[in-house]
Amino acid sequence: AYSTCSQLGYMFFALGVGAYPAAIFHLMTHAFFKALLFLGAGSVIHGMDDEQDMRMMGGLFSKMKVTAVLMWIGSLALAGVPIFAGFYSKDIILESAFAAHTGLGLYAFWAGIAAALMTAFYSWRLLFLTFHGRTRADDHTFDHAHDPPPVMIAPLLVLALGAIFSGFLAKEYFVGHQMDEFWGSSILMLHNIIEDAHHAPAWVIALPLVVAVTGILGAFVMYILKPGWPAVFVARIRPLHTFVYNKWFFDELYDRICVRPSFVLGRGFWKSGDGAVIDG
């Protein structure tokens, strides 16, 4: 999932500035809220008779309240909203990147801020298109939409607890006052990057929350208040939209560079080896 790739990006630039505990901390918290979102998506698909296109959903909060609340929890953690797990782990990564005081560290910091804005926007785009606004589903599918049975909801509830509390409960051990005792000799720290991160300027600490709220409000305007705006916006940047919508044409490029040559090579070996030598 591309969202997971972006969160792995946070972990890797934490490693790049030497904030190894912060990277592992985010790996742990991310496991809870991303698994919650994955299973929440499966819950929606199950309740919508295998429909997977958000453009064919909407208004499902009235039909799937438990799933909706759980996915809100996962999204709040992913966006780094205070008290949720992602707030503690993602923010210490951004603060560590800033505290590195290197060119690459500052580049990572601002790239992480941009990613935080986009993360909040696309997360609430998902929530608004799926659970809020008017429904775009056909009458039969919408009327029969439902939360899954308890046996499917139970794992989501466990993950939701982790998405809410794991960051707060673990922060002192992973990146706080008990960090040295917790890690022991497991991680070699060459400098005090985590300690420096805790003394980052106030604007550095506040900025991730500001951009997260901005992304949420942007999605609210675009998909609830002014649902016609996305189409107008897309029409104005059609070439860029086509490029991004097709994932930078990465699949097509991969097919041409890797898949097709592999098939050609395989056929060649089959004809010259198996066909000509073994069977011939």
PLM regions with names:
Residues 5, 30, 57, 86, ...:
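Divalent metal-coordination and catalytic microenvironments
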Residues 1-54:
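Alpha-helical multi-pass transmembrane bundles of energy-transducing inner-membrane proteins
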Residues 1-6, 48-84, 106-115, 140-165, ...:
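Interfacial and helix-entry/exit segments of alpha-helical transmembrane bundles
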Residues 38-41, 50, 81, 90-91, ...:
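Alpha-helical transmembrane segments of polytopic integral membrane proteins
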Residues 172-210, 221-280:
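Aromatic-capped, Gly/Pro-kinked transmembrane alpha-helices
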Residues 34, 38, 106-144, 180, ...:
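Predominantly late transmembrane helices and immediately cytosolic-facing juxtamembrane segments
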Residues 12-15, 91-109:
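Interfacial segments of multi-pass membrane proteins
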Residues 81-94, 98, 168-190:
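Membrane-helix interface motif
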